[in-house]
Amino acid sequence: MMPMNQEFIQKLRFNEKGLIPAIAQDWLDGAILMMAWMNKESLEKTLITGEVHYWSRSREKLWHKGETSGHFQILKGIRFDCDSDVMLLSIEQVGSIACHTGARSCFFQEVEENIPDLEQNSTFNRPLSNTCSELFEVIKDRSSNPQKNSYTNSLLKDGDNKILKKIGEEGSEFVMACKDNDHESISNEAADLIFHIQVALKYHKVEWRDVLEVLAKRRQSKSNPK
């Protein structure tokens, strides 16, 4: 639960209706999940409970995110912008679904036309920091919706021994690339190794975010030694 320090609320600039936009961001991989509105009441409720509450403009009442779907948002931190009129909520998304459509993020509709930079760099039209999380979502989708001739599906079908054998092979190739100090090969072999590790995680029903959470906790413990 977040500490009940509410002094910062006085610095916020709510609009004429007493509302302020709040953007929810995954606290582990930085993915933008959704945007909704808050007022002082919903913000105070969020701080007290540690679970995000918004203000529903259509229903004109508090909206406890996840109260019907079970996809609660656990508050991890709050920032607000230089004008103090937009908030960024760092949250843990329960169930990995923020959108009412069932998508992880509400921001899944992409505009790709008439944007020169996208045409020149179409491979990198999204944050690279999200790539591993997105890759794991693809692996999960392949598991739920098998596709013909899918390498991922063949690994999952063949099972643990095949997956672990591939991890051993890719690990050895990564070591050899490092010994040769071949930067391109190191990058390629590291990518192969990460992919096969993620397949193993999925096979054993371990979420990628569980790994990220372990890393985050280790980083926090090292930066805040007892």
From Swiss-Prot:
One of its GO terms (biological process) is L-histidine biosynthetic process. Its EC number is 3.5.4.19, 3.6.1.31. Residues 132-226 are annotated as: Phosphoribosyl-ATP pyrophosphohydrolase. It catalyses: 1-(5-phospho-beta-D-ribosyl)-ATP + H2O = 1-(5-phospho-beta-D-ribosyl)-5'-AMP + diphosphate + H(+); 1-(5-phospho-beta-D-ribosyl)-5'-AMP + H2O = 1-(5-phospho-beta-D-ribosyl)-5-[(5-phospho-beta-D-ribosylamino)methylideneamino]imidazole-4-carboxamide. One of its GO terms (cellular component) is cytoplasm. It is found in: Cytoplasm. NCBIfam families: histidine_hisI (TIGR03188), PRK00051.1 (NF000768), PRK02759.1 (NF002747). This is Histidine biosynthesis bifunctional protein HisIE.
